[in-house]
Amino acid sequence: MVIWLIGLSGSGKSTLANKIVLEANELGNKTVLLDGDVIREIFGDDLGHSLEDRFKNAERICQLGKFLDNQGINVVTAILSLFPESREWNRNNIKNYYEVYIKTPLDDLIKRDSKGLYEKFNKGKISDVAGMDIEFIEPTNADIVIDNSDSIESFLNHAKPIIEKLIHSQ
C-alpha cells in the first residue's frame, strides 16, 4: 500500500509519516518512508525548486512508490504533491493508493516554519515557495482530509486509523 501524505511545508507531513512508519513497523508490517526532501538528497541534490524540477522529483517519488508497492512493501510518502497529474497518475497506477491531505491554515504554517522558508520568502531572500509564489492546488479527491490547526496530540491521533488501513490492505 502507498499512503500519500500531502501538504505544504510545515503542515506536519513528516511528523505524521514518521509516526505511521514507526508504529506500522513495530506491528510487523514492513513499511518505508519516502520523504520528498530526503529523496532529493539521495539523488545528489540534482534538482532545484523550480516547477520543472519539482515535477521531476514528484515523478521519482511516484515511480519509487509504485516499485516498492509492487514488491509488497508498504510506503508512506511525505511530499508537497503540487501536481494534480501526479496524484492522478498514482490513482491510475498504484493498486493500493491512499491519499491524505493535511490541511493547515497559512498563519499556522508561518508560525511553525521549522525550515525558515516562509520567513526567508517574506524577506525576499528566496522564491519558489509552494503556497506563496508557487500555487498549491489543493487535492480534490483525497481519501481523507486532516485539519492540522489543533494540538500536536490531536493531530497525531490521525495516525491510528491510517495504520489500521495499511495493515488491513494486505
Task: Put a short name on every predicted segment.
Residues 77-79, 90-112, 146:
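Conserved phosphate-donor/acceptor-positioning beta-strand/loop module used by diverse small-molecule
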